[in-house]
């Protein structure tokens, strides 16, 4: 009887250590997956902008489709609660919500990516040199799972902008 009680106590102690560690690892893994998806979206946007001219949206601008695999809830993974894409805030922005971005003000050709996974903190990454914006009049907010985006290089008031929207 003492052996059974000892075994149960040992299992409870091990579970008390393993479960939080697994949750923490899941949050870290999901944050890394979202960061990788953001980097891929930025790379695809830059490639589109570098190889083409911006045209008005009604003149068949250059386009590219991109499929992102964003984390969903599961064992040892935290689901993406929200990923938003748009212009940076008007205040000085930084990486992961910091007050500054290496002491410089973000330029007008910048994009802000903001995300949070379940159990994690909100992250903000501002990428300078590329304007990725939701389709005019829309918002671009993504959640976990497979998402296919269409990127179009459009000219808006003479400025090159990557217009992003969900396909379909």
PLM features per residue range, with description:
Residues 18, 58, 83-87:
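General N-terminal targeting signals
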Residues 1-50:
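Hydrophobic alpha-helical segments
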């Amino acid at each position: 009887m003492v052996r059974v009680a000892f075994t149960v106590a040992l299992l409870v102690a091990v579970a008390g250590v393993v479960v939080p560690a697994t949750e923490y690892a899941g949050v870290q893994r999901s944050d890394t997956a979202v960061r990788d998806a953001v980097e891929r979206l930025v790379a695809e946007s830059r490639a589109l902008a570098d190889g083409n001219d911006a045209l008005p949206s009604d003149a068949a601008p250059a386009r590219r489709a991109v499929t992102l695999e964003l984390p969903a809830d599961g064992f040892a993974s935290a689901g993406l609660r929200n990923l938003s894409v748009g212009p940076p805030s008007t205040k000085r922005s930084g990486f992961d919500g910091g007050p500054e971005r290496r002491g410089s003000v973000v330029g007008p050709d910048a994009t802000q990516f903001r995300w949070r996974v379940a159990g994690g903190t909100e992250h903000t990454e501002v990428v300078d040199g590329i304007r990725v914006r939701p389709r005019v009049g829309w918002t671009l907010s993504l959640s976990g799972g497979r998402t296919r985006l269409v990127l179009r290089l459009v000219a808006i008031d003479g400025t090159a902008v990557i217009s992003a929207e969900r396909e379909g």
